[in-house]
């Protein structure tokens, strides 16, 4: 099944301490957002990309599209106050389509095969998300004292892209907006409707670049891929 993609690139990434939008930080000689967009741009099943950005930075992104020959960005949407608002704006900008994949621009290492698996699962189940099993011991803490050790056997760390039938995720966002509900990810809005969300095995290398330390991991992942 073909799909449309929404890629989020409006956050300023203050924890990166880069003095600019982290999407413009170079990773292996290319801006972070370019590496992310190239995955979707090179996927024949991707019909088009809506890029959510700060409107003051549109010109910078357009220059990157020209320089790196990114062809599938069909529309811009403005970033909102919260991530959820940014996604909603992106959904409003979609041209059409049955399946939408919503992805963080700061995750450049997603594989095309995972895009296909998620899109196909969204057709079957309505909603599908990638996740990896939690490896570390998780503690619930109160006032910097351990209150409880959480059983990690059923815990998964969720990633993006998250895939949905367009009609379902639109309904989920509309209902959340009416109720003033702010979720931690898009799948949580679908869960709120009582609808099932399918988990697919993700990839530990599909990291989100948030802090300067993440750049070190990203360079190592990039080097390992070049060596493959």
From Swiss-Prot:
GO terms, molecular function: 2-C-methyl-D-erythritol 4-phosphate cytidylyltransferase activity
Keyword Chloroplast among record annotations: no
Its EC number(s): 2.7.7.60
Gene3D superfamilies: Spore Coat Polysaccharide Biosynthesis Protein SpsA, Chain A
Pathway: Isoprenoid biosynthesis; isopentenyl diphosphate biosynthesis via DXP pathway; isopentenyl diphosphate from 1-deoxy-D-xylulose 5-phosphate: step 2/6
Family annotation (InterPro entries): IspD, IspD/TarI, IspD/TarI_cytidylyltransf_bact, ISPD_synthase_CS, Nucleotide-diphossugar_trans
A GO BP annotation: isopentenyl diphosphate biosynthetic process, methylerythritol 4-phosphate pathway
Annotated site residues (Transition state stabilizer) in this chain: 15, 22
Functional description taken from the UniProt entry: Catalyzes the formation of 4-diphosphocytidyl-2-C-methyl-D-erythritol from CTP and 2-C-methyl-D-erythritol 4-phosphate (MEP).
Family that this chain belongs to: Belongs to the IspD/TarI cytidylyltransferase family. IspD subfamily.
Record's protein name: 2-C-methyl-D-erythritol 4-phosphate cytidylyltransferase
């Amino acid at each position: 099944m073909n799909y449309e993609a929404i890629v989020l690139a409006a956050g300023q990434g203050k924890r990166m301490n880069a003095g600019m939008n982290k999407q413009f930080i170079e990773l292996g000689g290319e801006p972070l957002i370019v590496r992310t967009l190239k995955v979707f741009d090179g996927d024949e099943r991707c019909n088009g990309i809506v890029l959510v950005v700060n409107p003051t930075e549109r010109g910078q992104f357009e220059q990157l599209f020209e320089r790196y020959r990114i062809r599938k960005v069909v529309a811009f949407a403005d970033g909102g106050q919260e991530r959820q608002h940014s996604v909603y704006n992106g959904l409003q900008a979609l041209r059409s389509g049955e399946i939408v994949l919503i992805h963080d621009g700061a995750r450049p290492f997603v594989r095309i095969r995972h895009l296909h698996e998620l899109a196909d699962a969204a057709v079957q189940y309505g909603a599908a998300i990638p996740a990896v099993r939690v490896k570390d011991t998780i503690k619930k803490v109160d006032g910097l004292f351990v209150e409880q050790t959480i059983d990690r056997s059923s815990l998964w760390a969720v990633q993006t892209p998250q895939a949905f039938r367009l009609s379902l995720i639109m309904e989920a966002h509309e209902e959340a907006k009416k109720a003033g509900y702010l979720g931690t990810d898009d799948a949580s809005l679908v869960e709120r409707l009582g609808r099932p969300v399918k988990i697919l095995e993700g990839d530990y290398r599909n990291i989100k670049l948030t802090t300067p330390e993440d750049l070190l991991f990203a360079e190592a992942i990039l080097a390992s891929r070049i060596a493959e």
